[in-house]
Amino acid sequence: MIELVIVSRLLEYPDAALVQHQQELFDALASSENLDKEDAQKLGVFLRDLLARDLLDAQADYSQLFDRGRATSLLLFEHVHGESRDRGQAMVDLMGQYEQHGLQLDSRELPDHLPLYLEYLAQLPKEEALGGLQDIAPILALLGARLQQRESSYAVLFDLLVKLANASVDSQKVAEKIADEADRKSTRLNSSHP
């Protein structure tokens, strides 16, 4: 599924290679068979807007959004296991899956990094890839909602992934979780000021 490769690349740290290979991304988007016209257009707009930004500004915003704090971390197991011991075993298991399909990791890459997981899914037959997306759909929906709350354009990528997964995510539960997080944050801020 070429769409997973495109979204994977757009969820990586923006760099000069993104600018250098932009035409390949637009060509891949044009060849998509799994996106309707509206979704392909949204993805194209996101890509154009990202490329139009100053690279250093895009990098700073990316780091602020995805590298600081757990709420919008692109490390999938962060949202499932937190800092528990189960996270380590889950990573070992995922690395085993990658190796079974011939994917070799760079020693600096964590196996639960969403762009890497999407690259892995893109190599699988469509039904297996969709199953893998469905497995993480609740995390994707939660991340998308948190990004919408922050008014980030990256939210469109998560909405698209949930739609591609064709998963039934309880949007009411996601909204309640986001509202609860906002309430707790507000309470902490108010209690820290005498």
Segments (PLM) and residue ranges:
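Short, hydrophobic/amphipathic alpha-helical patches that form generic packing surfaces
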Residues: I2-Y13, F77-E78, L116-Y120, L160-K163
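Helix-rich interaction surfaces within compact, conserved domain-sized segments
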Residues: H21-F26, A141-G144, Q148-K173
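A general alpha-helix detector
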Residues: I6, E24-L25, K42-F46, L75, ...
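A glycine-rich, hydrophobic loop/mini-helix early in the fold
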Residues: A40-R108
